[in-house]
Curated annotation (Swiss-Prot):
NCBIfam families linked to this entry: SMC-Scp complex subunit ScpB (TIGR00281)
A GO term from the CC aspect: cytoplasm
Protein name: Segregation and condensation protein B
Major subcellular location class: cytoplasm
Length: 329
């Protein structure tokens, strides 16, 4: 303490000066000022990460019993829209059981909703068609709009080579089948083709046959049914259906190849009937005259041959008695 003209004064040295208190620590500063922006961000990020890792989305916490009780209160139209929404976001065909586990709606009501949706989203009516494929249900674009969809997406259509189609057909109709059996039918090596089909997930290994060498058994996959839009393997066309389909196509081609009747206003319709009849008579007369001319020429040819045989004075060749010698060639 010092005494000045204005009275006694306390002199407190500045922090850090000799004889004064030391500088404030970071803990002391934080206790007075609070956490800085960076500290607040770190705390928020840690809390957010902890919440995301411990807590699940509220929809997944809903028990299946509550879902069942809620689904019983849904109207028929609401059930249809729920099933439609779930199928729309699904990446693969969903079965009735999978739809039941996702929605809690009774299977009978799901089947009715699928029947209604099949009538709404059908080929030729809607751009989105509901198909029953691979044991489930799936929304797909209208096949008649495929060209425009591919053009927008800029993707090439998936095509199979002739060898791949033949091999895949043998596997589909003869499964489970071994590679030697496939090659015995096709008559060529099929190893590369089978590998290509497996890479495209159209064919899978079903196991091994219990015989010498334990050859691998091949069969079609779920992706095969999805690729060809088949409900199951029983939907494959039979040989009888193939012949009927071939005959139907043949009749369609023959029907399309028939000449069309002349349209009104054409040259055939505007021609003079009397002139047409005269031309037909003239053509018939020309044909008759041509036949008479051909007969006359044939008769003249016969007469000439007879005259030549009568006027022929060439003496016959003398006969030789020597039959043992070689004849001149």
């Amino acid at each position: 303490m010092t005494t000045g003209s204005n009275g006694p004064q306390d002199e407190t040295p500045e922090p850090g000066t000799p004889g004064g208190p030391g500088p404030f620590s970071e803990e002391e500063i934080a206790a007075v000022t609070g956490p800085g922006p960076a500290d607040e961000l770190d705390e928020l990020e840690a809390a957010s990460i902890e919440e995301d890792s411990d807590e699940a989305p509220p929809d997944l916490e809903t028990s299946f019993e509550k879902l069942l009780s809620k689904s019983r209160k849904l109207s028929t139209d609401r059930i249809r829209t729920v099933i439609e929404s779930v199928l729309f976001v699904a990446e693969r065909p969903l079965s009735v059981d999978e739809l039941y586990m996702a929605t809690g709606i009774e299977r009978e009501l799901i089947a009715e909703a699928l029947n209604q949706l099949s009538g709404i989203h059908r080929d030729g009516i809607s751009g989105i068609v509901l198909y029953e494929v691979a044991g489930g249900w799936q929304f797909r674009t209208d096949p008649h709009s495929g060209e425009y969809v591919r053009r927008y997406l800029r993707v090439k259509p998936q095509r199979l080579t002739r060898a791949a189609v033949e091999t895949l057909a043998i596997i589909a109709y003869r499964q489970p089948v071994t590679r030697p059996e496939i090659e015995d039918i096709r008559g060529v090596d099929c190893g590369a083709v089978i590998k290509a089909l497996m890479d495209r997930k159209l064919v899978k290994i079903l196991g091994k046959r219990e015989e010498v060498g334990r050859p691998i058994l091949y069969g079609t996959s779920r992706e095969f049914l999805e690729f060809f839009a088949l409900k199951d393997l029983s939907a494959l066309p039979t040989l009888r259906e193939f012949h009927e389909l071939t005959q139907e196509h043949r009749e369609i081609v023959e029907k399309e190849d028939k000449p069309a009747p002349p349209a009104a206003g054409t040259v055939e319709a505007l021609s003079d009937p009397a002139f047409t009849k005269r031309m037909e008579k003239s053509a018939a007369a020309s044909e008759a005259a041509l036949e008479d001319l051909e007969e006359a020429m044939a008769a003249a040819d016969r007469t000439q041959k007879v005259s030549s045989s009568v006027l022929d004075t060439t003496p016959p060749e003398p006969e030789t008695g020597d039959t043992t010698g070689p004849k001149p060639e």
